[in-house]
Amino acid sequence: MTSSPLSPHPDQPADASHQARTADASHPPAPPVDASHPAHLVHTAAALRDLPRGTGVRAVVMTMGALHEGHATLIRAARRRVGPAGQVVVTVFVNPLQFGAGEDLDRYPRTLDADVELAAAAGADVVFAPSVDEVYPGGEPQIRIAAGPMGALLEGASRPGHFDGVLTVVAKLLHLTAPDLAFYGQKDAQQLAVITRMAADLNFPVEIVGVPTVREDDGLALSSRNRYLSGPERCTALALSAALFAARDRLAAEEALRARAASVGHHPAPDRAAALAALGEDRAAADAHAVAYAAAGALHGPAVARAAALAVLDDAARLDPPLTLDYLALVDPSDFTEVPDAYEGEAILAVAAKVGSTRLIDNIRLVFGAGRPEATAAHQGGTTTDAVDTGDTGDTADTATSAAAASSPSAPSPSAPSVTSTPPATPPTTPQGPLGATR
């Protein structure tokens, strides 16, 4: 990707950076959508072209069906952004090109009637549900779009050819739907990144709007594949989000220790204990040791975050049923390469694992060096966060004791995110990025 998917607010003017826009979840929800008029269901590109487009802009939400609240959040965000004069198109297409050998193409849920109902209730004007022959006339295309080096990492390494299939169908659906805006969930962070890069490199005149991950009350990221999980498997699957939250909280604890070390200074041990006592600490000696450790630079954000997440995942591997880890990676959002231990700035902590026969993915966005002025400014400037997690860097711990407690793998259950209420959009004047198929 030319630039990070962690990017400015969707209300900012379009520019030539090709950055994925992100919905800000800090605004109150918009009024309920009037679903008295059902969405038009069309199956061909010709039928879609024949529908009146109106005077506003068109937004598209690309899905593979089996719609759930995560998809509804995308549709509502699109509805709010385009306003009453705009048009929201939801595509429902299970793309065979992005399934590898032995994957779940045949059993992938297909619930079109329910999908149309949910889409209409969330604010969609049109549901475009083409057949495989409509999208790929004459069979699988001989020419496909290659995802390049970024598409060979993580998900691409585990599922060879997956992102080539994603990019090929996204390009075709963008041509068929001709949107001005495209909305995509941040749960599939690598997919969002490769599609944004494709849009930048190939000059698609579409603006991406990234929408924060939607989670269940217990933290599990919403996915169409969650329905495959049995009760015990679902309990094990909670380790994915728990691992991410543990890394977030441990990072916050480390930053608190570093800030305290800076405030106490490099005094001899007795003076340090006295300084901590003056701050109101009850356990001055223990805290002095922890602060001295932080001041010496022994803690490193990326290494500590990885270790905290791995501890949770290692425990989950011993559950019944067990979690089988595919990867845990802390990556630079611009190219999805692993970040070094000295890294400062925004990063994505991504995890993929199997529980039973179901493969699940999740991610969280972290800021390393959050207490430093330059990192804080970047984090507050509209960059992406996982809205469910009320601040991925976590709250600053008040004491070294609470900092240690924050390294526990347990984390509070996140609340459901709100979706930005944004004013009607105008068509972008410069090429932006498109939106990919929602998994």
What are these regions (language model features)?
Residues 2-11, 15-18, 24-320, 331, ...:
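Nucleotidyltransferase catalytic core that binds NTPs
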Residues 307, 311-359:
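Acidic/histidine-rich
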Residues 348-406, 416-439:
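Generic C-terminus detector
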Residues 3-7, 17, 26, 402, ...:
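Serine residues within intrinsically disordered or low-complexity segments
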Residues 11-14, 19-23, 28-33, 385-401, ...:
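Intrinsically disordered, low-complexity tandem-repeat regions
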